[in-house]
Every structure is written in structure tokens, then in C-alpha cells.
UniProtKB/Swiss-Prot annotation:
Lineage of producing organism: Eukaryota, Metazoa, Chordata, Craniata, Vertebrata
Species of provenance: Xenopus laevis
Annotated gene: pten
Family the UniProt entry places it in: Belongs to the PTEN phosphatase protein family.
Protein's UniProt name: Phosphatidylinositol 3,4,5-trisphosphate 3-phosphatase and dual-specificity protein phosphatase PTEN
Motif PDZ-binding mapped to chain: 400-402
InterPro entries: Bifunc_PIno_P3_Pase/Pase_PTEN, C2_domain_sf, Dual-spec_lipid-protein_phosph, Prot-tyrosine_phosphatase-like, PTP_PTEN, Tensin_C2-dom, Tensin_phosphatase, Tyr_Pase_AS
Length: 402
């Protein structure tokens, strides 16, 4: 019965079922393991039991392994693993802070520089967050030239249905890191002013009476809550900030539908972007070539070449339906048309023009105007994104250590 429960909980992830072990654990490479959370007590009945994980690692890689815990929401007794545990935490169903990725890759690189060492990387389910960081490392090591190839490879090896990293914002951050590597860029948080948001086509919440509201987060702090309703035009909605909102680094925008004051908010979608990757008019000639980034041919959801004469003064980013967390799962087009798009409009700040050392750690002012529960930790456990493109299975048999 326990084996059946474990199989059900791990869903389509590949399990390690050899030598008397039955663990939600996969060798992505001979020296890189992706696994589910090593749990204790009752949770250990249906997830990886921490004692079984210790026994496995001691029997296979004694004194040559290190655990990487990506969970922000939970911990365990690191003494079980002789304190060989590093923590690079970020929230479930969210991407990591961009500045977390490079130190993780450098840490992993140092560990694996010794031939016998093995890294065991986990989040809660050992799929999404784990996949983001493993894919970033594979790009860091030059194992794949493009983010899409690393994501496809991970999805094929870790799961039976090729759905590894499926959340759009998490995938976006793998592309971000790929772009930095490809162009030998040093990341720095870029301060911008956020002016407005535009919907192309109207979402179909409550029929034609959709009433979207939104919040903006930075550094896990809610910095803006919309109060005024959107402006409407044929097949368009506009959301203007009362005054330009200063943002820098990783930001999250979350949309809700609220029909009236009595009804509860209904989650529509959310997304994460980083201000470093939002281009201005003068940057298009360098960064965009035939609608794609120079040096990276598959960066959907990072740059858009759509620009009207009225928008020339703005730095513009367009996100399609498939680039939006939660909206991308509306396969039947019940709530969003297939052409639904969100456009974001920014300008550079005086600080950005004069100070290249700006940091996302700059203090932010919390917005407490709505007195409503903070939805930052929103979790949707029913995630299922579009399947990745087919992967060449011949590559699986040719894997060597990273």
C-alpha cells in the first residue's frame, strides 16, 4: 500500500526502484540527482523518507555527496546528512531571485570538480524548482547551447511525460540565465518606472463584465494595489498607474477578477519578470534580430518587437497567454482567447541613467492600502503546461558526468 501511495504522489516523475530502494529520485547525470523532499514522520510515508535517503546516499556515495535544499517553506535535521546541506531557498511555484542562480552554479561547480562527488538537489516535489536550478547549471557548464534544449533534456530524464519545468515564469528565468551566459553579461538590477499595463482581448470572467484588479510585488513585498478600474476599448483594456511605480530587479504582477465588493477575488494569472531584460528603443538594434534575441533563438516571453508610434518612448514587454502562469493552462480558451496578450510599459529612471550600481536590495515601501490577505505564496498544485517538444532519446544513452 505504501508503494502505491508513493507512486501516486510522485505522479509522472521517474523513481529509483533498484537495490531495495523505492525513492522519488532520478539521476539527471551520474553526478547530479533530482529528488523529492526528504521527509520525516507521517509525510515520510508518502514522500521520500529521510532515513531511506540517508541510507541510499551512504550506500552509493558515502562521504562524497552534498544536499541542495531549494525549499523556502521547510527544513529538516541536517545532522542526518552530516550537515552536508546547502540552502538556496525560493518559494514553491515561483522562480528564484535571479541573483541566487549564479552562486548556486558556482557552489555546484566547486563540489563536482572532485571526480567522485555527487549533488542531490531537491525542492518539495523535486521537479519545478529543482529543474530550474539544474537546467541553469547545465547551461553554466556549457552542456547545452540553448535554454530550450536544457529544459527538454531535464523533462525527458526526470519525468515520463516530458513535463519537467512547466511554469512559464520558472522557464523564463532559465532563459534569462542562458542569455547572460551567451552574451557574457554581468547581471545588475536595473531600476525602471512602471507606467501601465495593457490587455489585448478581454478575459471572459463573468462573461463580458470582467473586472480585473492587480498587485505588484518586489522583494516579496507588495508595493502596489490597483484601486481604479481599467479603461476599456474594443478588445482592449488599459491599466494606468496613478503615478509611475519605481521597480527594480525581480517583480511579480498578479491579476484577480472581483465582480463586486461582496464576491471574493478570483485568481486570473500572474507572472515574474526581471527589469534587466526589458529593452528600450535604442536596444532593439543590438538585442533583437528578426524578432528574436541575437545569440538566443527561442526567448519567447522575454522580448517583443511589437511597437507602435505612440509607444516609442517606452521600454515595452509583451507576454502571450502561454507566458502567463495559470492562464497558460486554459487550453479550452474558456477564460482567455488564444490571442490574449499582456503588454507592460516602462521608462528608465534618472538613477538608471547615472548609477550602474543600483540594486534590487534598495528599500521598497510596502503597500498596505487594501488590508487583504497577501497572496504572495499562492500555490497551484494542479500545474500542467504545454508539453515540451520531443527530445532525442538517443542522447540519454550517451550521458557522462557533468
Amino acid at each position: 500500500m505504501t508503494a502505491i501511495i508513493k507512486e501516486f504522489v510522485s505522479r509522472n516523475k521517474r523513481r529509483y526502484q533498484e537495490d531495495g530502494f523505492d525513492l522519488d529520485l532520478t539521476y539527471i547525470y551520474p553526478n547530479i540527482i533530482a529528488m523529492g523532499f526528504p521527509a520525516e514522520r507521517l509525510e515520510g510515508v508518502y514522500r521520500n523518507n529521510i532515513d531511506d535517503v540517508v541510507r541510499f546516499l551512504d550506500s552509493k556515495h558515502k562521504n562524497h555527496y552534498k544536499i541542495y535544499n531549494l525549499c523556502a517553506e521547510r527544513h529538516y535535521d541536517t545532522n542526518k546528512f552530516s550537515c552536508r546541506v546547502a540552502q538556496y531557498p525560493f518559494e514553491d511555484h515561483n522562480p528564484p531571485q535571479l541573483e541566487l542562480i549564479k552562486p548556486f552554479c558556482e557552489d555546484l561547480d566547486q563540489l563536482l570538480s572532485e571526480n567522485e562527488n555527487v549533488a542531490a538537489i531537491h525542492c518539495k516535489a523535486g521537479k519545478g524548482r529543482t529543474g530550474v536550478m539544474i537546467c541553469a547549471y547545465l547551461l553554466h557548464r556549457g552542456k547545452f547551447p540553448r535554454a530550450q534544449e536544457a529544459l527538454d533534456f531535464y523533462g525527458e530524464v526526470r519525468t515520463r511525460d516530458k513535463k519537467g519545468v512547466t511554469i512559464p515564469s520558472q522557464r523564463r528565468y532559465v532563459y534569462y540565465y542562458s542569455y547572460l551566459l551567451k552574451n557574457s553579461l554581468e547581471y545588475r538590477p536595473v531600476p525602471l518606472l512602471f507606467h501601465k499595463i495593457e490587455f489585448e482581448t478581454i478575459p471572459m470572467f463573468s462573461g463580458s463584465t470582467c473586472n480585473p484588479q492587480f498587485v505588484v510585488y518586489q522583494l516579496k513585498v507588495k508595493i502596489f494595489t490597483s484601486t481604479a478600474g481599467p479603461k476599456r476599448a474594443e478588445k482592449l483594456m488599459y491599466f494606468d498607474f496613478p503615478q509611475p511605480l519605481p521597480v527594480c530587479g525581480d517583480i511579480k504582477v498578479e491579476f484577480f477578477h472581483k465582480q463586486n465588493k461582496v464576491m471574493k477575488k478570483e485568481k486570473m494569472f500572474h507572472f515574474w519578470v526581471n527589469t534587466f531584460f526589458i529593452p528600450g528603443p535604442e536596444e532593439y538594434s543590438e538585442k533583437v534580430e528578426n524578432g528574436t534575441l541575437v545569440g538566443e533563438q527561442e526567448l519567447d516571453g522575454i522580448y517583443s518587437t511589437e511597437r507602435s508610434d505612440n509607444d516609442k518612448e517606452y521600454l515595452t514587454l509583451a507576454l502571450t497567454k502561454n507566458d502567463l502562469d495559470k492562464a497558460n493552462k486554459d487550453k479550452a480558451n474558456r477564460l482567455f482567447s488564444p490571442n490574449f496578450k499582456v503588454k507592460l510599459f516602462f521608462t528608465k529612471t534618472v538613477e538608471e541613467s547615472s548609477n550602474s550600481e543600483a540594486s534590487s536590495s534598495t528599500s521598497v515601501t510596502p503597500d498596505v492600502s487594501d488590508n487583504e490577505p497577501d497572496h504572495y505564496r499562492y500555490s497551484d498544485t494542479t500545474d500542467s503546461d504545454p508539453e515540451n517538444e520531443p527530445f532525442d532519446e538517443d542522447q540519454i544513452t550517451q550521458i557522462t558526468k557533468v
